[in-house]
């Protein structure tokens, strides 16, 4: 006879194979809510043993051990144990929180067949606590069917209505049982703990937060919630000093420091620090979305995502930032937002030393060093570092864009993109640089901008040694060496290195220009082009060269300019060996060898090697003359014509340093140098 230790001292569970009557002095009880849909043919919802006086045994039923499923992740893997001394140090609210978390984890594992239907634990409760697990349905021996589990807690003093008499005559041959034998179990008189449990069934939430009005079904839940407002955090990490609301949260956090990831996905090999993360991750592969919104029918793979989504319908933003007054739907969003004001970056990469404000950002960053891309699209085979990238990519195949802007009607793949887009209309820029005061509509843009001040370039090309501030820039740069152009235009067949370039190119076919300058009325394909154009009117030049002090309106122009000082020319033509400072110059040069002229004028059919040449040419058709000689009022189609005017003005801007002789053009200056070297 196999035995296993459980909660109380001296307790053993034994599989007897058939139902036996309980010992004298013990009665079987059940929660009234669980019994509302009683049916003998399908089993009963569950019951607990009520110790009225000391005796030798109590009867509790359990699933047949022969049908247990061997799981990849067991409850023991995700359980957290306390010693008797540690348990006595916890206050009642902390004990409630601990038990709630343990039962929720166990229920999740059982529902996914990752845990067998029996529960084992150590003696972690005091004499005034009783621990009990209820099975929502029971296994019938003649069908050998493993069914689900429902967990609940009855603690201290409780009493339920007897159902044992109603079971007589319907027991024999249907169920396998377990007997709990024990030395002593304390008795209870007064009913207290059943009422909180019944609130689960009737959805009563009588505990209301005075700060934000949120309602909770249990007092312990309210205590836990109120800590988000009071910032009461007693559990401190010795590694980094960060504080947490509970010991469980601290234990979860400490795995960031240890790097421990014992849970591995069989589908893609990805590892996780916690079993619950593995369970959630596996839904990406299976496509399971068990949480559905009753308001709009949208389904989610995680209950947390459903909770977040439902706030979109209610519009409640109960978490407010004390620094700037901005309100959020969720406490986690507020916590992340507050880091913008404090500038705290506790998550540091051991590989390159880069620090991050959020743990998930560090996890994402580390994949740049490993190059691991476990998420592969089954349609086109493209692989991604993160699951959310795969999810967003798959929308390109379906073409689904459910999020529409009410202002201009533009549709988006995901809600976050819509939120970012709406800031173009509202002009909201919540992310401000403390260094120069410049504000941005996206936190990502602020992070990129700050690297201009620090000069940090941690991402280096192994091919030519060029360094970049951002990993995405390195990825794009490496395509110059590999020649990879995976993004193809379906309209004309032209290929591009990045999806961003393809998107901008496609506008040439549609002719759409939704972004208009309020100053001069000129329209643009994308918002960034409008921002850059507006600097012509304002005269703003935020990008300054530290070498010579020259300022530029675009960061790209500053990068190009700095190569004049360094003399760096990493881009070399394979055909003739000529080197260039910029990749775009190499691309233009290569067209000399291929004679490619992909830019065609729709007015006369003439083709050009670059878009710039086409733009200049089109001015002949439109008659547009942007460049004016202020002295004479004469206008020109292109800026190079202004250089001609130097012959009339006697302007000689290029001077030879050796003798001081001045020249109209740089070519004359170079000829002078060659002559001196010959002499």
UniProtKB/Swiss-Prot annotation:
PROSITE patterns: KRAB (PS50805), ZINC_FINGER_C2H2_1 (PS00028), ZINC_FINGER_C2H2_2 (PS50157). CDD domains: KRAB_A-box (cd07765). It comes from the Eukaryota. One of its GO terms (cellular component) is nucleus. It comes from Homo sapiens. The keyword Zinc applies. Residues 73-152 form the KRAB domain. This is Zinc finger protein 283. Detected in prostate, testis, and pancreas. There is a cross-link at residues 280, 476, 588 (Glycyl lysine isopeptide (Lys-Gly) (interchain with G-Cter in SUMO2)). Belongs to the krueppel C2H2-type zinc-finger protein family. GO terms for biological process: regulation of transcription by RNA polymerase II. One of its GO terms (molecular function) is RNA polymerase II cis-regulatory region sequence-specific DNA binding. Its main location: nucleus. May be involved in transcriptional regulation. Pfam families: KRAB, zf-C2H2, zf-C2H2_6. It is found in: Nucleus. Keywords: DNA-binding, Isopeptide bond, Metal-binding, Nucleus, Repeat, Transcription, Transcription regulation, Ubl conjugation, Zinc, Zinc-finger.
């Amino acid at each position: 006879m196999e035995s296993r230790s459980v909660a109380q001292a001296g307790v053993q569970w034994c599989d007897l194979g058939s139902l036996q009557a309980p010992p004298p002095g013990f009665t079987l009880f059940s929660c009234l809510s669980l019994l509302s849909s009683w049916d003998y043919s399908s089993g009963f919802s569950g019951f607990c043993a009520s110790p009225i006086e000391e005796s030798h045994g109590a009867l509790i039923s359990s699933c047949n051990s022969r049908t247990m499923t061997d799981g990849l992740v067991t409850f023991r893997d995700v359980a957290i144990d306390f010693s008797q001394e540690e348990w006595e140090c916890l206050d009642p609210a902390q004990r409630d929180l601990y038990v709630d978390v343990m039962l929720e984890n166990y229920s999740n594992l059982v529902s996914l067949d990752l845990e067998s239907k029996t529960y084992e634990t150590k003696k972690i409760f005091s004499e005034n606590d009783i621990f009990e697990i209820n099975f929502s349905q029971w296994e019938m021996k003649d069908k050998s069917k493993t069914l689900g589990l429902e967990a609940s807690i009855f603690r201290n003093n409780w009493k339920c209505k007897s159902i044992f008499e109603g079971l007589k005559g319907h027991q024999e041959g249907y169920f396998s049982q377990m007997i709990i034998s024990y030395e002593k179990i304390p008795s209870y008189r007064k009913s207290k703990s059943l009422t909180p449990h019944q609130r689960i069934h009737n959805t009563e939430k009588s505990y209301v937060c005075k700060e934000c009005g949120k309602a909770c079904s249990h007092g312990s839940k309210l205590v836990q919630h109120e800590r988000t407002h009071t910032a009461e955090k007693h559990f401190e990490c010795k590694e980094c000093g960060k504080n947490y609301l509970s010991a469980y949260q601290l234990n979860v956090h400490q795995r960031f420091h240890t790097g421990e990831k014992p849970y591995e996905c069989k589908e893609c090999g990805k590892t996780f620090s916690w079993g619950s993360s593995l369970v959630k991750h596996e839904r990406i592969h299976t496509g399971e979305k068990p949480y559905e919104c009753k308001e709009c029918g949208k389904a989610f793979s995680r209950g947390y995502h459903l909770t977040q989504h439902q706030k979109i319908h209610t519009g409640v933003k109960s978490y407010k930032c004390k620094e700037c007054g901005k309100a959020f739907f969720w406490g986690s969003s507020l916590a992340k937002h507050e880091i913008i004001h404090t500038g705290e970056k506790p998550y540091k990469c051991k590989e390159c030393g880069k620090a991050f404000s959020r743990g998930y950002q560090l996890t994402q960053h580390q994949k740049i060093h490993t190059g691991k891309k476990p998420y592969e699209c089954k349609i086109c085979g493209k692989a991604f570092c993160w699951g959310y990238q795969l999810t967003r990519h798959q929308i390109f195949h379906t073409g689904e864009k459910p999020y529409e802007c009410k202002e201009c009607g533009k549709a988006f793949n995901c809600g976050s993109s819509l939120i970012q887009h709406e800031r173009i209309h509202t002009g909201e820029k919540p992310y401000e640089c403390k260094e120069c005061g410049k504000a941005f509509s996206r936190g990502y843009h602020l992070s990129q901008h700050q690297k201009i001040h620090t000069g940090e370039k941690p991402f280096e090309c192994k091919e030519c040694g060029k360094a970049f501030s951002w990993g995405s820039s390195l990825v794009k740069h490496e395509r110059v060496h590999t020649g990879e152009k995976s993004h193809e235009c379906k309209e004309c067949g032209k290929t591009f290195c990045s999806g961003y370039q393809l998107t901008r190119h496609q506008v040439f076919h549609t002719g759409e220009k939704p972004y208009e300058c309020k100053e001069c009325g000129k329209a643009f394909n994308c918002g960034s082009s409008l921002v850059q154009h507006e600097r012509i009117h304002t005269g703003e030049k935020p990008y300054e060269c530290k070498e010579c002090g020259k300022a530029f309106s675009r960061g790209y122009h500053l990068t190009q300019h700095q190569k004049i000082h360094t003399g760096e020319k990493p881009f070399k033509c394979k055909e003739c060996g000529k080197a260039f400072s910029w990749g775009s110059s190499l691309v233009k040069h290569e067209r000399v060898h291929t004679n490619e002229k992909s830019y065609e004028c729709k007015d006369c059919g003439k083709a050009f090697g670059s878009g710039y040449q086409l733009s200049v040419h089109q001015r002949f058709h439109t008659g547009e003359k942007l460049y004016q000689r202020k002295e004479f009022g004469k206008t020109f189609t292109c800026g190079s014509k202004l250089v001609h005017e130097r012959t009339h003005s006697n302007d000689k801007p290029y001077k030879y340093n050796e003798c001081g002789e001045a020249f109209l053009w740089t070519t004359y200056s170079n000829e002078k140098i060659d002559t001196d070297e010959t002499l």
